[in-house]
A protein has these predicted regions:
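Structured-RNA-binding interfaces characteristic of tRNA pseudouridine synthases
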Residues: 2-288
């Protein structure tokens, strides 16, 4: 079982006099410097927080917590955030507020849904799965899709990539595919990783309980070497087993990546899920 607990995290529940809102978002990440607020840069978080403050007529700034933090250029079809706001907003029509938010936001961000979150909901810590897709075009992409697909100049062997991807499924230490961070862990459960042919090329779909920094783009980069015939189907598993970040693993461009969906625990299990997620995982889980 996990032992140590992550510190300096936001409270599990809203403070006295506040309620928690859940907002579902979609955005084109092309012109954003990622999700997280950064001084003098346009980010999704800063744009959404400004719009929330205006739409709800709040004097104090709004702070949002995101379910899946995205890097510069990464897109989202199913992002989820929460924000704690004064109880007075309960007098508002959330449908009208969502409409107002979409009027305040630029066209590359859209509010898909806005509701009062159930007890125990936390956009980050109550999640049980996150799903991403990564798309390649066959050769030069259609100009209308160039911001969402990465060109592949060689025919990709989808069967070989699926064979290699299957070897990475389950609970593993994905350090070999994650950029180093001071905190956290690289132990993840990869539930889905498959490839399919699309109208424009090839798409990978990955779903895990969580992903560490650059994990999706690095795994995809590793698998492309298999699809192009440069490596055998056992190569990604050999890289995984090193448990060391490999310089030879290419991190693919951001614009081919889309956060598709975040799945949450049932309402009656939200608080329990927070406790599980906040616990830092260690190698003993894999050994057992």
């Amino acid at each position: 079982m996990p032992k140590s607990i992550l510190h300096n995290e936001p409270p599990a529940l809203p403070g006295r006099g506040f309620i928690r809102l859940r907002m579902d978002l979609s955005y084109d990440g092309t012109m954003f410097a990622g999700w997280a607020s950064q001084p003098k840069l346009r980010t999704v978080q800063s744009e959404v927080e400004k719009a929330l403050q205006i739409a709800f007529h709040l004097k104090a700034p709004v702070t949002t917590i995101v379910g899946g933090r995205t890097d510069a250029g990464v897109h989202a079809r199913g992002q989820v955030i929460h924000a704690d706001v004064p109880e007075s907003v309960l007098n508002e029509d959330f449908g009208k507020i969502a409409y107002s938010l979409n009027g305040l936001l630029d066209a590359d961000v859209r509010v898909l849904d806005l509701i009062q979150a159930p007890y125990g909901f936390d956009a980050r810590f109550a999640a049980i799965a996150r799903r991403y897709s990564y798309s390649f075009s066959n050769g030069a992409p259609d100009p209308l899709y160039r911001n969402f697909v990465v060109p592949s100049w060689r025919k990709l062997d989808v069967d070989a990539m699926n064979s290699a991807s299957a070897q990475l499924l389950g609970l593993n230490d994905f350090t070999a595919f994650c950029k180093r961070t001071q905190f956290g862990t690289s132990i993840r459960t990869l539930n889905q990783f498959d490839w399919r042919v699309t109208d424009f090329g090839v798409m990978a779909t990955l779903e895990a309980d969580a992903f560490c920094y650059s994990m999706v783009r690095s795994i995809v980069g590793c698998l492309i070497s298999v699809g192009e015939g440069k490596q055998d189907t056992d190569y990604p598993k050999r890289v995984l087993d090193t448990k060391t970040r490999q310089d030879e693993v290419v991190t693919m461009p951001a614009h081919g990546l889309v956060l598709e969906k975040i799945t949450y625990a049932p309402e009656e299990e939200l608080m329990a899920r927070q406790e599980v997620t906040r616990a830092k995982r260690d190698s003993a889980e894999i050994d057992n």
